[in-house]
Amino acid sequence: MLSTVQNPRFLLRQCRHFPPKRRRFHSSTPLFLSQPQTLASTDPPSSPPQSQILTIRDNLINRRTTAVELAQLSLNRLRLTEPQINSFISVSETVLREAEEIDAKIARNEELGPLAGVFVGVKDNICTADMPSTGGSRILENYRPPFDATAVKRVKDCGGIVVGKTNLDEFGMGSTTEGSAFQVTANPWDVSRVPGGSSGGSAAAVSARQCVVSLGSDTGGSVRQPASFCGVVGLKPTYGRVSRFGLMAYASSLDVIGCFGSSVADTGILLHAIAGYDGLDSTSSKHEVPNYTSQFMSISSLESKPLKGLRVGLIRETLDDGVDKAVVSSIVGAASHLEELGCTVTEVSLPSFSLGLPAYYILASSESSSNLSRYDGVRYGSQVGADRLNSLYGDSRAKGFGPEVKMRILTGTYALSAGYYDAYYKRAQQVRTLVQKSFKAALNENDILISPAAPSPAYSIGEKKNDPLAMYAGDIMTVNVNLAGLPALVLPCGFVEGGPAGLPVGLQMIGAAFDEEKLLKVGHIFEQMLKGYKFIPPLLADGIAC
């Protein structure tokens, strides 16, 4: 028996349009197991959540430590945790040399970049010069790009140290990181569970403190769902906010490079470093890039209702029967805390919500069938020896691509074929327009929208690997945001039962186009409601420095 959220009739049914509903959100305390210091609380901490980036910078400038010492500490933590997590496909060999260069700058009293000495993980579908960039696929196993992606170049220009390339589902096609051709990444909160996907390696690396921040990509939720599963902050920017140059194309009208951090401040600092117009990407926007963290303040220094007047819409369809009840309780609790901060929280309906998931998979698969045609063993990709050209193409792709990639290429080719284009691809584009209109209407009445980031907490490795429908259904909370091209921030809001210390739940905040600044400001205030705000996984409880 399929659960409601797995049932195709649930995914395809037309949602009724509900009028806005205003009610008080009383938290029915979810199962916040162990580590009570992480519970959402009405008693704010005395200081805001610590920014690791700002702490590193302050320690370097005031010479309390050196970049080399920090690098050695981080590499040691990575060596201790990596055998259990498998976050990285490859680790840079130049880390210590880059750290030495930062120390030399300090010795010469030169100005440091905003990311100086900060360890940054990079998802392995984002190109890095002179480092492997595999896309998680055998067909690119030996590929070393001659250039950096624009986002990577900007990280390096700001002094960031790329520690390595993180694991992912092949070409970003998956929700568990089990689809990698090289290894399966585990969730630091429970190593028997998935970290989410497709940016599972990037999320797990930040959660396990193997790096300070990381870059991922988000086509249908690949930053936000892993952030929820791993208890970290994840940001999907507006489409066009961050250059896609150097990102391996999956679905070009949906792909976005996003950010992970252990705090909203670190995530905002990373976004500021990589955002902005790039002439190498024709979809890049010329919208001004604000200083996302310049207005961040401790909640103790603000008025008692720091978010007074903010209109928040809780998306009703995201609390449906197919969503884990403990997850719903956590989100309702988060809505209650937003009200305590001064927000007006109202239930809103997105009439086209349930149509987004099937439309997304038609559009994404169609675009991938075109984008991945370049990997033929001649222009790109590993080549398999063959006597005839057609055999070379076929054998190279058959042996180079994994099963999920093949399935999506076939699905996309079918949807674009003569006789089926109007029935599938064209209708999916029409649904996309409906989704965009639904969000526009909702955001005309609300400043931000909120929902769960995923319908469940992290599940066991292998649990859904052979059930594509169930795995696809897990994206229902996130794909609509990509169809609309809007920004969304995910941050931890509590725990539910599972694993040795509970499993994190993520709250998704959705904003208007290019309004990342508002999302980050609200997120920064909200996270200070979490006592001590240290979502430290059990993996790090055994004496490994955090």
Swiss-Prot record:
Keywords: ATP-binding, Chloroplast, Ligase, Mitochondrion, Nucleotide-binding, Plastid, Protein biosynthesis. Residues 27-43 have a biased composition (Polar residues). The keyword Plastid applies. The keyword Nucleotide-binding applies. It is an enzyme of class 6 (ligase). One of its GO terms (cellular component) is mitochondrion. Residues 21-52 are annotated as: Disordered. GO terms for molecular function: ATP binding; glutaminyl-tRNA synthase (glutamine-hydrolyzing) activity; hydrolase activity, acting on carbon-nitrogen (but not peptide) bonds, in linear amides. One of its GO terms (biological process) is glutaminyl-tRNAGln biosynthesis via transamidation. It holds the Pfam family Amidase. PROSITE patterns: AMIDASES. Its EC number is 6.3.5.7. Allows the formation of correctly charged Gln-tRNA(Gln) through the transamidation of misacylated Glu-tRNA(Gln) in chloroplasts and mitochondria. The reaction takes place in the presence of glutamine and ATP through an activated gamma-phospho-Glu-tRNA(Gln). This protein may be expected to contain an N-terminal transit peptide but none has been predicted. Belongs to the amidase family. GatA subfamily. Subunit of the heterotrimeric GatCAB amidotransferase (AdT) complex, composed of A, B and C subunits. This is Glutamyl-tRNA(Gln) amidotransferase subunit A, chloroplastic/mitochondrial. It comes from Vitis vinifera.
